[in-house]
């Protein structure tokens, strides 16, 4: 029964991830070309359909190296300009001081630092979605010895890319206040990236950088939909050997995804964030149980599992109704999160000792 619940939950997460990584590239491509955004939605969905239906080495495996290269070029180019601009005085990077360790959100009352920070910024820290992609990536490796550089290296690289872009956005718009003003004026992340790349990297560099920005979400979306197809097919024990069978599973998924594309991005992303962290929490407790049963030190998994339990329970208590929370006072959420974390720890230790 728990397995069925996790399958449904993972399918929901993958759908939300796929949807959230359609609008951004479509909007940016529409701005660059002047074509209607709906047309680009159809183009991106067409790619997703082929990537979802065909074997992973036919499309995804062939285009990923180029997309990854563009993404790394974009990050390194922007990072290099940050260093150059700060050295020459062209830009000013905000220094980390005691005063800067606070909530800079334009609406801090509705977006409290804890637990919102650990839900909105989730992929580079610990991610349930990325865990669902591990089997796909593992099948693409010729030898198990590549697992460490591939998975650990990807985690570190993603963290570096995220830090570069966070710094770039703050520096370009004149600090957190300017970044908030740009967001309040209706500038989406895709629009901001377009502005920064065109301003800092020149025309050629901007083209490659934009390619990386478009490729980054698309490479998450295609694998999300592919994993969702496999999960749904496995849940219903529906063979996927024939193309017709794959279409039977995929078509309803894409119909629902297309409808969801017209929802507010920030709302979808918060659902992605909390779903991501709940799945990561379950995975950490599972890994802790495995280590304990194997006679190994389990605290390396137990402590992060407790922290994420606190984060998830607190978020579900204090988040607004529209993003799945109960809109309770922050103190209630903090207490509930701590109690839940230690209660699960006590249950975990009790179960492990009985074994």
Residue ranges and their predicted role:
Residues 3-5, 66-81, 155-164, 250-254, ...:
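Small-residue-rich segments of transmembrane alpha-helices in multi-pass membrane proteins
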Residues 1-3, 19-41, 88-113, 177-191, ...:
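Inter-helical loop and helix-membrane interface segments of multi-pass membrane transporters/permeases
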Residues 82-96, 152-195:
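Extracellular/periplasmic helix-exit of transmembrane alpha-helices
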Residues 61, 75-87, 91, 98-106, ...:
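A generic transmembrane alpha-helix motif of multi-pass inner-membrane proteins
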Residues 5, 38-43, 153-162, 170, ...:
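Loop-to-transmembrane helix boundary motifs in multi-pass membrane proteins
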Residues 1-55, 122-126, 212-221, 240-241:
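Helix-loop-helix module between adjacent transmembrane segments
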Residues 1, 22-41, 134-159, 190-195, ...:
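Helix-loop-helix connectors at the membrane interface of multi-pass transporters/channels
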Residues 17-32, 45-67, 234-237, 260-268, ...:
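Membrane-water interface regions at transmembrane-helix termini and the short interhelical loops
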């Amino acid at each position: 029964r728990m397995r069925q619940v996790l399958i449904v939950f993972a399918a929901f997460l993958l759908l939300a991830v796929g949807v959230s990584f359609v609008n951004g590239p479509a909007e940016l491509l529409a701005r660059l070309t002047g074509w209607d955004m709906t047309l680009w939605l159809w183009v991106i969905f067409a790619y997703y359909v082929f990537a979802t239906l065909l074997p992973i080495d036919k499309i995804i495996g062939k285009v990923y190296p180029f997309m990854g290269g563009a993404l790394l070029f974009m990050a390194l180019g922007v990072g290099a300009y940050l260093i150059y601009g700060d050295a020459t005085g062209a830009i000013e990077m905000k220094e980390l001081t005691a005063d800067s360790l606070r909530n800079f959100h334009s609406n801090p009352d509705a977006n409290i630092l804890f637990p919102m920070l650990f839900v909105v910024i989730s992929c580079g820290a610990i991610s349930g979605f990325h865990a669902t992609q591990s089997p796909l990536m593992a099948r693409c490796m010729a030898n198990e010895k590549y697992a460490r550089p591939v998975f650990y290296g990807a985690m570190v690289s993603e963290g570096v890319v995220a830090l570069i872009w966070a710094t770039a956005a703050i520096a370009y718009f004149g600090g957190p206040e300017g970044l908030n003003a740009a967001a309040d004026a209706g500038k989406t992340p895709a629009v901001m990236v377009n502005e920064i790349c065109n301003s800092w990297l020149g025309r050629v560099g901007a083209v490659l950088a934009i390619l990386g920005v478009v490729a980054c979400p698309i490479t998450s979306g295609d694998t999300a939909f592919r994993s969702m197809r496999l999960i749904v097919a496995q849940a219903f024990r529906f063979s996927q050997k024939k193309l017709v069978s794959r279409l039977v599973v995929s078509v309803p998924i894409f119909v629902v995804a297309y409808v969801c594309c017209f929802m507010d991005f920030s709302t979808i992303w918060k659902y992605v964030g909390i779903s991501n962290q709940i799945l990561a929490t379950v995975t950490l407790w599972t890994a802790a149980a495995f280590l304990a049963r194997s006679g190994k030190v389990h605290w390396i998994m137990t402590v992060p599992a407790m922290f994420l339990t606190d984060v998830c329970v607190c978020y579900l208590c204090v988040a607004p109704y529209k993003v799945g929370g109960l809109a309770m006072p922050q103190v209630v959420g903090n207490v509930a999160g701590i109690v839940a974390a230690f209660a699960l720890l006590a249950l975990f230790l009790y179960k492990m000792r009985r074994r």
